[in-house]
Amino acid sequence: MNSKNVLLTIVAILMAVVIGGELCVYFGYDLYQSENGIFLRHKVYIATYQNMSENELRQRTETGDADAMAMLSCTIFNAHKGTEYKEVLELAQKSANNNCPSGKNMLGLLYTIGYCVPQNLQKAFDLYKDAANENEPAALNNVGNAYLSGLVVEKDTIQGLMFLEKSAIEGFPTSQYQLGTLYYNGGKTMQKNVNKAIEWYTLASDQGMPLAQYELS
């Protein structure tokens, strides 16, 4: 796969992360027993922000709520696909400047695709890494994929899988699906393990991911 195709693949994943409504708060966890042992599984709770109208989000941003800023940036981004709105960038920047992990992840996306800013994959990676250091699930996924592709940083499969697994354990369905696929296919990346593949597919399927549901059908 050439660098252009790798970039498009990463962007597609990032777009799915935002457009798929994954910009939310993850917290709480329970223990899940499987044939291979006990896995820590985070319950995913959709933040109140995701159910708010644009006007409600604007009211929250006026109070300095950095999470609401990130969600509003995402909301406007989704509502005007194909058209660049400076407010999307301004909100993401303000949220990130207030040390909001979701805001950093959103700003990283904008630098990845060159939305209202010159495309800068290194800056995008740095933002993802900062957010990943605070265990932001989508950012952990983005960092993992960056290491796996080797496009922005030196390719490091071990690091990539580590971040991907952290994201999956945090409850991020995209990472759970990816791990399921890696275990199902096997190869140089990891040893084939159908049972583990089914476990990860099941976790992603439980959160409504169509691709995982298809693999289990």
Annotate each PLM feature:
Residues 41-45, 76-85, 115-121, 149-157, ...:
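Short coil/turn connectors between adjacent alpha-helices in alpha-solenoid helical repeat scaffolds
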Residues 71-79, 106-113, 117, 127, ...:
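Hydrophobic face of amphipathic alpha-helices that form TPR/SEL1-like repeat modules
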